[in-house]
């Protein structure tokens, strides 16, 4: 897009669906929070597509872990999400035709949740204005979201730095306890 071409064009090499697809779903979530869907039909439509993206995580990971066949993935979309069979079949074929890496379908929701969590940490606490947050995110470009968080925090990264996926409050503490 315009911002990444203007500010950090070299970062296109590090493009990640967690940023690109996550950014799109993040906006859907923000529009929901701002009351954009006014009618019951609008609300149902937005919830349907959010459920669809959650289902992508389940069927994609299940398929790649060998616990679901493509046919079971189609059945899952028909029975749980209420897709028409032809639409579910096309979605599964599109997901597994070799054009997308295994975690691509999970990137929509997981990327959105990462951006949402970063927004909670920076905007909801008053540390950053919402417009500044969005502008800064776009200026940094499509790099891993945890890298953007470290840039915003002006954190110096060591050569052995490990990212932390912060998309659920308290997850870092519960993961640390298990180690």
Give names to the regions the model predicted.
Residues 1-179:
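N-terminal maturation segment of proteins
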């Amino acid at each position: 897009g315009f911002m990444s071409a203007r500010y950090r064009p070299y970062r296109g090499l590090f493009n990640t669906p967690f940023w690109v697809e996550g950014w799109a779903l993040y906006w859907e979530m923000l529009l929901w929070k701002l009351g954009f869907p006014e009618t019951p039909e609008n609300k149902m439509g937005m919830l349907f597509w959010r459920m669809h993206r959650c289902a992508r995580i389940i069927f994609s990971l299940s398929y790649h872990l060998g616990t679901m066949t493509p046919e079971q993935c189609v059945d899952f979309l028909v029975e749980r999400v209420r897709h028409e069979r032809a639409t579910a079949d096309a979605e599964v074929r599109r997901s597994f035709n070799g054009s997308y890496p295994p975690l691509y379908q999970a990137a929509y929701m997981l990327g959105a949740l990462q951006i949402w969590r970063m927004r909670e940490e920076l905007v909801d606490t008053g540390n950053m204005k919402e417009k500044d947050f969005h502008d800064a995110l776009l200026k940094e470009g499509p790099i891993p979201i945890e890298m953007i968080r470290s840039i915003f925090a002006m954190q110096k990264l060591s050569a052995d730095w490990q990212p932390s996926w912060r998309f659920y409050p308290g997850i870092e503490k519960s993961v640390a306890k298990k180690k």
